Amino acid sequence: MPGAYINDEDKNGFMSCFYQMDFSKGLDLFIHSPGGDVAATDSIINYIRAKFKDDVRVFVPQLSMSGGTMIALCGKEISMGSHSNLGPIDPQFGHFPAQLVLSEFDRAYQEMKSDPQKASVWMPILSQIQPTFLTQCERAIEWSKQIGEKALITGMFAGDPDATSKAE
C-alpha cells in the first residue's frame, strides 16, 4: 500500500502531534506499521526519546514490522493483543528485505561456482544490481541491529546489568 511505509515525512507528523504537549506525562504510542526506511526510523526514535526520555509505552494492536518493531523497542514496555505481531528487524530496499538480497546473491555465486553454465541464467538478474547495493544491504542490516540494541539497552533494559547481552 503506497505511502504506508515509514519515511522522512513521518517525523514531521510526530512533530505536529507533539507540538505543545506536556512531555512530562509520557507517551502512549500505538503502532501499526509494515516498517520502512532505516534512517527515518532512527530519526523518529531519537526524536521520541529526546521529547519523552524513557517514558514511552507502546501498544501494537495488530502488527509492527521491521522499522515499526524498532520504534516499538524504544518503549519501556510493549503491550500487544493475543493476535498481534512484532515482525523481524529486516531493513527493506524497494520492498525486498536486505538479507534476502544478500542470500540470493550468495546463492547465485554458489551456483555459478559449482556450475559455470548457470552464469547465463544469473547474469541478466545480477546485471540489474548496482555495484554498491550489496554493501548498502550489509550496512542497513548492521545499522538496524544497532538501532534495535540501543533502543532496548536504553529503554526496556535500562538499569539492568545484563542489558547489553539481553539486547544482543
Predicted regions located by residue number:
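Terminal-region recognition feature
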Residues: 1-168
